A protein has these predicted regions:
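Gly/Ala-rich phosphate-binding loop of Rossmann-like dinucleotide-binding domains
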Residues: 17, 21, 164
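Short, flexible, mixed-charge acidic loops at enzyme active sites
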Residues: 39-45, 132-136
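Dinucleotide-binding Rossmann-like beta1-alpha1 core, especially the glycine-rich loop
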Residues: 45-129
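Glycine-rich FAD pyrophosphate-binding loop
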Residues: 21-41
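Flavin (FAD/FMN) cofactor-binding and adjacent substrate-gating region
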Residues: 70, 95-168, 173-174, 179-182
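Short beta-strand/turn micro-motifs composed of small residues
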Residues: 8, 31, 96-97
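Beta1/beta-strand and adjacent pyrophosphate-binding region of the FAD-binding site
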Residues: 1-12, 28
Length: 182
């Protein structure tokens, strides 16, 4: 009998299977389309970042960055000894007009408390860093260093996660859930 049955084998379902299997849980993932041609994750940019408003999301972003940087070690399997997600590190620039500036200043307090490495740039100083951006109407902007944020190939990341989850004992089956009961 399985400890956990996960409905859907996209990024979230597969990551859940990986982490639970790593803890020794018996996991089964039920996925209706194992080719993932109708899944949303292959179409996404695969961004990872720390610039959020809530502390929990900032900390999750920091965790994700550390995990992504360790993919070659953490997700290595016998079948895939050199996993990758084609990571590109390039900081995110978020810009705010006067109507959202105060909210962003409050968020920066959370960034500092979480040691997120976020830098505040006044709108009037934005062209010093990014001369190609028209800063009219920009009150403030935030930016992290180029090693803290970026993007990955989500399909490659999913494949590495799934391969490792399977090696750890997770079972992926094709199927569709029609109903749930106690």
């Amino acid at each position: 009998m399985d400890d956990v049955v996960i409905i859907g084998g996209g990024i979230i379902g597969t990551a859940t299977a990986y982490f639970l299997s790593k803890e020794g849980r018996k996991v089964k993932v039920i996925e209706r389309d194992p080719t993932y041609k109708t899944a949303s994750f292959p179409l996404s940019l695969g961004g990872f970042r720390r610039q959020f408003f809530q502390t929990e999301n900032i900390l999750l972003g920091k965790f994700a960055r550390e995990f992504i940087f360790q993919i070659p070690e953490l997700l290595k399997t016998e079948k895939n000894p050199k996993p990758t997600a084609s990571m590109v590190t390039n900081g995110y620039l978020l810009m705010f007009g006067p109507e959202h500036a105060e909210e962003q200043y409050k968020a920066l307090e959370n960034h500092k408390a979480c040691e997120a490495g976020t830098k505040n740039i006044k709108g009037s100083e934005l062209s010093n860093f990014f001369p190609y951006i028209n800063s009219d109407g920009i009150e403030t902007a935030t930016f992290t260093d180029n090693q803290s944020e970026g993007w990955i190939d989500p399909f490659m990341f999913h494949g590495a996660l799934k391969s490792k989850a399977i090696e750890l004992g997770a079972e992926f089956v094709k199927g569709e859930i029609k109903s749930l009961s106690e």
